[in-house]
């Protein structure tokens, strides 16, 4: 008689396909077959168990295929000292359910070691017939039932689950979440706003296993954009030219060129320009040298050995992202208006409309939306209003004096947008000027936090 009960099938082993990114990532594959006793088995090839370093996380992509003519229940179990396994909310398939003949399930799992020494995690597949009742988990094995949300999902859920208040600015009605100081802009991005939101996060750490104010920098979360967290450094890295080329070095005039794709500040912040004798990738590689500052190719000494990107771990957290370079020729605009212009096609003759890279600057709209629009009803050039400056958390970061923004002026070849020391936003500064630089970047979409509440005394801590 064929057995109609749950069968615990052997241990699933993980194949060692490692993908560089926020986590070490593995692909896992198993095929379900049926033996002569009507048991369902999992066939594994090229496998090893997963060793997780102390206080670290690995992401596992688990593939399960049923090649038997039948439907079976499935679940995923795990064991290991100080090991916790959770499933991601953006997993392709659920962590438990049924799998049809010829079909596969793709489950995204987080394997975390909370101990102070490395530990080995063992994953196992638990199977049963479709009508065979609940899955029975053997002794020493834990069924994966907890979910792990990326930080972007966590913040999005904070906003979605909160009570909203309508705020009208420039005839646009925004939905504000006063409890968490979150709002949704005209592009459906979720942003932090106000005087002092809880958007602090440790980043650029020398030791991610022991994150603190002595091992990490404090950055701020601008918001969630296309499923990715956007950060800004909590203070400037110094004052440098946005670009200071002259006619002899490639500009249309001697005041610099407002093309971010070739800007000297871009080459200072990003990788790939190490061969440049001045400024090339110095911030990205935490090195010292000379940087461009002042008119007509002028330079000054610069040192990023303590303020630059510290290590490969941090560099692997940074996502390549499209930054928009649409311009505008009037600073009498509201946040919703300049947001659309940034993503538009109005540029100075021949300038590109977007750039893909790792590190850039804040948009004018980032600065504009950081203000509490329920209190600050001005257009951007009037953000020097004391009510606006006192209710905009980004003011002290971007412009304790003058601070550069990313967006070019579309009508002139050598002007870009910037924040004046008083808090107003303008576009009429020559790019050769040396203004404050607050780096902006996006984390990889699967970035998670292991602890923290986002307050200044308890910043979020990234799980790596």
Functional labels for PLM-detected ranges:
Residues 5-15, 19-22, 43, 123, ...:
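Long, domain-scale functional regions
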